[in-house]
Amino acid sequence: MSVSVYLLDIEGTVCPISFVKETLFPYFSAKLPSLVKSDDVSIKSVLAQFPQHGDSQALQTHIQSLVSNDVKDPTLKQLQGTVWSQGYTSGEIKAPVYKDAIEFMKRKENVYIYSSGSVQAQKLLFGHVANPDNSGSNESSLDLNPLIKGYFDINTSGKKLESSSYEKIVTQIGVAAEQVLFISDNVKELEAAHAAGVKTLLAIRPGNPPVQENHGFRTVEKFDSL
């Protein structure tokens, strides 16, 4: 059965893995001291979900620890999404999506995204993409969201290292597992997807950590050939 659905990871696959750790995380950390003391009702409601919410300093330390250790905490992801929204809207942040990935998304009809980052954060990222062809013009930002059929995160579908998450996604999309191609830079994610019957490709991008030998997956360096 041929592939009809493309499920894409984000960092290390369609954009540099450094974008999150060198741009998004530092931006969030810089805002954190004022964030934990915010009077914004929407932010306070998210902060209240952390056990340390009664002590702003302890809360800041706890959240920064989660960020530093890249913990996939749903509440943290929600908070980060809120902060990054402000950065994207102000123009302080633009996502450096690879040009070949942009062209791929324009060519294919059934493109879905699966990331540990919240659906909100995913939509923000793809809604504020640095235009590789017009980086110095007024059209320096692209909105790729119209090219994306749907989004999945750890809240909607589960953690990316669990095969049941991919089973849920396949069910939600409404196709057979073998019709879905999942592309990621993470071998363990690919193993989980493969266990669910999903087809897989390992993304090899500049700056990605070296992968183990004999990983057993087909690889792709650019999406031009897909």
Swiss-Prot record:
Compartment(s) where it occurs, according to its Swiss-Prot or TrEMBL record: Cytoplasm; Nucleus
Catalytic reactions on record: 5-methylsulfanyl-2,3-dioxopentyl phosphate + H2O = 1,2-dihydroxy-5-(methylsulfanyl)pent-1-en-3-one + phosphate
Pfam families documented for this protein: Hydrolase (PF00702)
Its EC number(s): 3.1.3.77
MF term (GO), any: acireductone synthase activity
Cofactor: Mg(2+)
InterPro entries per record: Enolase-ppase_E1, ENOPH1_eukaryotes, HAD-like_sf, HAD_sf
Record's cofactor remark: Binds 1 Mg(2+) ion per subunit.
Gene Ontology biological process terms, A to Z: L-methionine salvage from methylthioadenosine
This protein's pathway: Amino-acid biosynthesis; L-methionine biosynthesis via salvage pathway; L-methionine from S-methyl-5-thio-alpha-D-ribose 1-phosphate: step 3/6; Amino-acid biosynthesis; L-methionine biosynthesis via salvage pathway; L-methionine from S-methyl-5-thio-alpha-D-ribose 1-phosphate: step 4/6
Keywords: Amino-acid biosynthesis, Cytoplasm, Hydrolase, Magnesium, Metal-binding, Methionine biosynthesis, Nucleus
Binding of substrate, residues: 115-116, 160
Record CDD domains: HAD_EP
Enzyme class: hydrolase
GO cellular component, one term: nucleus
Binding site for Mg(2+): 9, 11, 185
Chief location category: cytoplasm
Protein family per UniProt: Belongs to the HAD-like hydrolase superfamily. MasA/MtnC family.
PANTHER family, per database record: ENOLASE-PHOSPHATASE E1 (PTHR20371:SF1)
Stated role: Bifunctional enzyme that catalyzes the enolization of 2,3-diketo-5-methylthiopentyl-1-phosphate (DK-MTP-1-P) into the intermediate 2-hydroxy-3-keto-5-methylthiopentenyl-1-phosphate (HK-MTPenyl-1-P), which is then dephosphorylated to form the acireductone 1,2-dihydroxy-3-keto-5-methylthiopentene (DHK-MTPene).
Oligomer status and interactors: Monomer.
The protein, known as: Enolase-phosphatase E1
